[in-house]
């Protein structure tokens, strides 16, 4: 517990909250070839590697991921949600923030149904999260 005098001399320092998705908070100035502080909700990027990785201890699966080089020259690992995907190397994707708890180092999600990423096939519920169009009614 500080004394009144210590608080007058120094004061309280606010804690600075660290971003959960730091690559979305950087832009790139191609003329100056330098990074700028421009935050955005999503960013575009090009897949440099597409593969699978195994999750942390209690879980077991082959989770699909893509290594993405963003427009701000930062390379990040992004999760590919949903069943099945059409991504390859050099596919152009849109990423958003949001980590995957059981994959270490994966802090971003790829947006399904945007740019080169197709929506999930035959999905009926929660379609908006997976970029699936409304199915045609058969009468």
UniProtKB/Swiss-Prot annotation:
It comes from the Bacteria. Gene3D superfamilies: Nucleic acid-binding proteins. Signal peptide: none annotated. The modification 3-methylthioaspartic acid is found at residue 102. CDD domains: Ribosomal_S12 (cd03368). Residues 130-139 have a biased composition (Basic residues). One of its GO terms (cellular component) is small ribosomal subunit. SUPFAM superfamilies: Nucleic acid-binding proteins (SSF50249). It holds the Pfam family Ribosom_S12_S23. Residues 27-42 have a biased composition (Polar residues). InterPro entries: NA-bd_OB-fold (IPR012340), Ribosomal_uS12 (IPR006032), Ribosomal_uS12_bac (IPR005679). Residues 12-55, 119-139 are annotated as: Disordered. Keywords: Methylation, Ribonucleoprotein, Ribosomal protein, RNA-binding, rRNA-binding, tRNA-binding. GO terms for biological process: translation. GO terms for molecular function: rRNA binding; structural constituent of ribosome; tRNA binding. Belongs to the universal ribosomal protein uS12 family. Part of the 30S ribosomal subunit. Contacts proteins S8 and S17. May interact with IF1 in the 30S initiation complex. NCBIfam families: rpsL_bact. With S4 and S5 plays an important role in translational accuracy. Interacts with and stabilizes bases of the 16S rRNA that are involved in tRNA selection in the A site and with the mRNA backbone. Located at the interface of the 30S and 50S subunits, it traverses the body of the 30S subunit contacting proteins on the other side and probably holding the rRNA structure together. The combined cluster of proteins S8, S12 and S17 appears to hold together the shoulder and platform of the 30S subunit. This is Small ribosomal subunit protein uS12. The lineage of its organism: Bacteria, Bacillati, Bacillota, Bacilli, Bacillales. The gene is rpsL.
């Amino acid at each position: 517990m500080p004394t009144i005098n210590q608080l007058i001399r120094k004061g309280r320092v606010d804690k600075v909250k660290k971003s959960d998705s730091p690559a979305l908070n950087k832009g790139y100035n191609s003329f100056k070839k330098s990074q700028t502080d421009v935050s955005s909700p999503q960013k575009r990027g090009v897949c440099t590697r597409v593969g699978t990785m195994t999750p942390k201890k209690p879980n077991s699966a082959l989770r699909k991921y893509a290594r993405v080089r963003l427009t701000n020259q930062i390379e990040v690992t992004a999760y590919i949600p949903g069943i099945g995907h059409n991504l390859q190397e050099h596919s152009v994707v849109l990423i958003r923030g949001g980590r995957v708890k059981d994959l270490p180092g994966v802090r971003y999600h790829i947006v399904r149904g945007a740019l080169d990423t197709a929506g999930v096939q035959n999905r009926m519920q929660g379609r908006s999260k997976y970029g699936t169009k409304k199915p045609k009614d058969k009468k």
